[in-house]
Amino acid sequence: MKQIRVELINTGTEILLGSIVNTNAAWLGNRLFEAGFRVGRVTVVPDGYAINEAMRESARRADIVIVSGGLGPTSDDVTREALCDVCGVDMHRDEHVAEWLKSYFERRGIPIAECNFKQAMVPDGAAVLENSNGTAPGLVMPASGSLPMFILLPGPPAELKPMVEHSVMPLLEDLADEDIPHLRVFRLVGIGESDLQELVDGSLHQVEGLEVAYCARVGEVDVRLVGSEVALKQGEARLRILAGAYVLAPAGASLEKAVVCHLAQQDLKAATAESCTGGLIAKRITDVPGASGVFEFGWVTYADRAKTEMLGVPENVLKRYGAVSEPVVKAMAEGALERSGADVAVAVSGIAGPGGGTPEKPVGTVWLAWAFRGGETRTEMMLYPRDRSSFRKMVSQRALAGLLDARRKEPVTE
């Protein structure tokens, strides 16, 4: 059975201006994938008659074209007219829809405006889809000749989603690919996108029928595998053999959730000592349900005096090396470990910017330390010259990733 080609068209000048995010495309793409369809292209056009050409172009490539938006009562809502133009048909007033519109407004005690009856105009040959949450009915024009099936949906997500679930999916289920592909996403930390691809790409592409894609995030890389269950099992096995040290567990979890799960499994408690991140590391840990079982204490020691009074960092070390230095961050981590009674402590001190940098310590410099009870303290320096928010997120990512190395030390027996 051939793969059904699906394209999405979203109308809305506000999307192109960046005033709103195109959540409809993301939701539809995911929902259609779950049902066995692959969206091949998404097109966004401004309100008005640009929709005509977009529909013509999609009609040349796709078997199903789904359009969202442009079904309202105003003059720039012209998706119905565009469908008539592309299909070469006229429109008629559907009296059933017109009566429904009247009752819709009457129930709300609002007089209906004449322009609202525009929404009762239906292209000849199209079927009407009921809208349970608004006034814009959806429309389905069956495939005919060289033209694909057109499905017209209202733009507001609160109207679009129920219509898709209740009307569109039952309509499409008989057309779906019988061999529905599966998706599995693995999140990795501690390795960059390019290095990861070099490490695993050749092996993964040897798996027949497996599609591989990479998505870089701040301090993380997602690997998306698409294919049959057999292909996914083979792909996952190869990924874990080659890059298992970087894969978060449980699969698909956020880094902070993975940290909490890891600490719980190891029966460890953690503490944090933060300067440049201002408590972000502690916040991310405590955002996870169950964090109370693994998180002991957190300090935000922004000033040098706080580092000395709260964490015991020696004044002479601060004066000699400066707050952003290996000796200071090491002392912060060890002080947090001692004062909290935790099993592992992470400390960070850096220059988030935009000011405060020097030739020796430019903006973006950060030192991190992880102190382990009964073990050696590990330190690391990073240079991440980005905006303040991205810098703080990246530092918190690296700090959390280091906590995944914490292990419960078994007592030594004679």
Swiss-Prot record:
Coiled-coil stretches noted in the UniProt entry, renumbered to this chain: none
Protein name according to UniProt: CinA-like protein
SUPFAM superfamilies named among the record's database cross-references: CinA-like, Molybdenum cofactor biosynthesis proteins
Pfam families, per database record: CinA (PF02464), CinA_KH (PF18146), MoCF_biosynth (PF00994)
TM region positions: none
Organism: Akkermansia muciniphila (strain ATCC BAA-835 / DSM 22959 / JCM 33894 / BCRC 81048 / CCUG 64013 / CIP 107961 / Muc)
Family classification: Belongs to the CinA family.
